[in-house]
Amino acid sequence: LDDLEKLNRRRFSSHQMSESKDSPLFAQEIKASYEKEPNLVDGREILNKSFAEFLTDPRVFILGEDVGKIGDVNQTLAGLQEVFGPLKVTDTGIREVSIVGQGIGASMRGLRPIVEIQYLDYIFYPFPILSDDWACLHYRTAGGQKAPMILRTRGHRLEGIWHSGSPMAVLINGLRGVHFCVPRDMTQAAGMYRTLLAGDDPGVVVECLNGYRLKEPMPTNLLEIQVELGVPEILREGNDLT
């Protein structure tokens, strides 16, 4: 019975996340650095430059609604289909289930897809697939299979009936086995994408809808920034409130 208990513990109490040396939890933080008087740009420009660098990796492609011809609805991918071609930046129909399914399959075969769900509200259309076929794949196979797809979306605007939701509690509790990254600005988002792409776990990045045209200083080391996952960022420390 002791041997069976040890075996079952290994079978059913391990591998929710990657346990390899490539786990994104091992990523070291590389902070943004700036010139004394940095150039201020729209947040979307920071992501555009970052995605252009990611796409130079032959394994990386971006798939989703309006990501190609119009450069996505917030212009973070503007011009990238022209540079890299429609196989690297691919427009799809309005079929979230198909988008996610293609991404999961590609990631299981060694590619590194970044699939876009245009708004966070729409993540519930493919939710059964995300929950049953993606988030728990590593756990169900005791680490034998991986699907390190990155699901990119945006939300939190909280300013209207549509395209404004922030159902994070449902997602965090419903998609065990996935890293959830919620950046406060697009520089931090770029670092989170880089950390996830360097690792071998699945991840969701929820960008802030109101951040694409807010001005941010352009880092001098934008293409090197990494965010350490699971470690809170301290913006201002105090005696009563931090």
Language-model regions: role of each:
Residues 53-54, 234-236:
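A short acidic-Thr-Gly-centered motif at the start of a beta-strand
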Residues 2-211:
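Thiamine diphosphate
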Residues 236-242:
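Short, acidic loop-beta-alpha module within alpha/beta folds
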Residues 211-233:
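Aromatic-enriched
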Residues 169-170, 232-234:
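Short, flexible, solvent-exposed loop/turn segments with mixed acidic/basic and small polar residues
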